[in-house]
C-alpha cells in the first residue's frame, strides 16, 4: 500500500509522523520504503543519523521529487509491502502527484485556527484527487495538542473536523511531548523510548491507519 503524509502548513509534525510510522512498520517485519519527497530532506537526514548510530532495524529511504512522482511510486509499490511518502508542508506537485496512486493520505493538523483553515484547503486537494483515484481514503489527525486539560483547542478542532463527511477523523490525538524531539535526536521512534504516553499515542494511531481499528483506550493528555 501507499500512504501519503501531507499538509498545507508546516510545523504540524508531518515528517516526525512519517519517521515513526516507517520505523514501526520495519519493527513489525514489513518491507517498508520511506519516500522523502520534501525538499528539506528531514526524513533522509534522520535515516543517516539512525545508520550512524547502528540502530536496528535499518529503515529504507529514497529521495524523490517532481510532478511524475506517481509513476515512480506505481513502480515501487511492486517491490515493497508498504510505501510511506513524506511530502512538503504546502500544496506541491509531489503531493498532488502521489495522491493519484495512493490508497491513503494522512493529514496532520495542529489545533489552531490558522492550521484548520489551511487543512480545509488540503481537503479540497484530496477531494479533487478522489475524482481521479476513487479508492483514496483521507485521514486527519490532531497533532501537537496542549497537555493542559483546561485548554479545549484539541476538542474544538475535533468538532470542526468532524463536519467533513469525506474525511476520516482519527480518534487518537498526539500531544506535545518532549519525547517526540528526543527520539529524533537519538535516531529512534517514540516507541523505542521509555515514554509510555507518546508510545501509546503512536501505537493507537498506527492501528487506526493500518489496521482500521478504533482505539478502545483514549490517549491521556497529562505529561
Task: Map each language-model feature to its residues.
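P-loop/Walker-type NTP enzyme "switch/lid" segment
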Residues: 2-8, 12, 20-89, 93, ...
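Walker A/P-loop
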Residues: 15
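Conserved ATPase-coupling elements of RecA-like P-loop NTPase cores
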Residues: 45, 92-98, 116-118
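Inter-motif core of Ras-like GTPase G domains
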Residues: 94-113
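Conserved C-terminal guanine-recognition region of P-loop GTPase G domains, centered on the G4
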Residues: 119-135
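Beta-strand-loop-alpha "switch" segments that mediate conformational coupling across diverse proteins
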Residues: 144, 158-188
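C-terminal boundary of histidine-terminating zinc-finger modules
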Residues: 184-199
Amino acid at each position: 500500500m501507499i500512504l501519503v503524509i501531507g499538509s498545507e502548513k508546516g510545523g504540524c509534525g508531518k515528517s516526525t509522523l512519517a519517521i515513526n510510522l516507517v520505523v514501526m512498520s520495519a519493527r513489525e517485519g514489513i518491507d517498508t520504503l520511506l519516500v522523502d519527497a520534501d525538499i528539506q530532506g528531514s526524513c533522509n537526514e534522520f535515516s543517516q543519523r539512525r545508520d550512524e548510530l547502528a540502530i536496528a532495524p535499518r529503515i529504507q529511504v529514497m529521495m524523490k521529487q517532481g510532478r511524475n512522482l506517481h509513476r515512480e511510486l506505481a513502480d515501487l509499490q511492486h517491490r515493497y509491502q508498504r510505501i510511506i511518502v513524506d511530502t512538503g508542508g504546502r500544496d506541491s506537485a509531489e503531493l498532488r502527484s502521489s495522491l493519484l496512486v495512493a490508497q491513503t493520505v494522512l493529514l496532520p493538523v495542529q489545533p489552531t485556527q490558522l492550521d484548520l483553515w489551511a487543512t480545509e484547503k488540503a481537503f479540497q486537494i484530496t477531494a479533487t484527487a478522489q475524482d481521479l483515484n476513487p479508492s483514496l481514503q483521507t485521514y486527519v489527525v490532531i497533532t501537537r495538542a496542549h497537555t493542559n486539560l483546561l485548554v479545549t483547542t484539541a476538542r474544538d478542532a475535533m468538532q470542526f473536523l468532524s463536519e467533513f463527511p469525506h474525511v476520516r477523523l482519527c480518534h487518537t490525538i498526539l500531544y506535545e511531548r518532549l519525547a517526540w524531539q528526543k527520539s529524533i535526536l537519538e535516531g529512534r521512534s517514540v516507541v523505542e523510548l521509555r515514554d509510555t504516553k507518546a508510545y501509546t499515542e503512536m501505537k493507537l494511531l498506527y492501528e487506526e491507519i493500518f489496521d482500521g481499528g478504533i482505539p478502545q483506550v483514549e490517549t491521556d493528555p497529562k505529561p
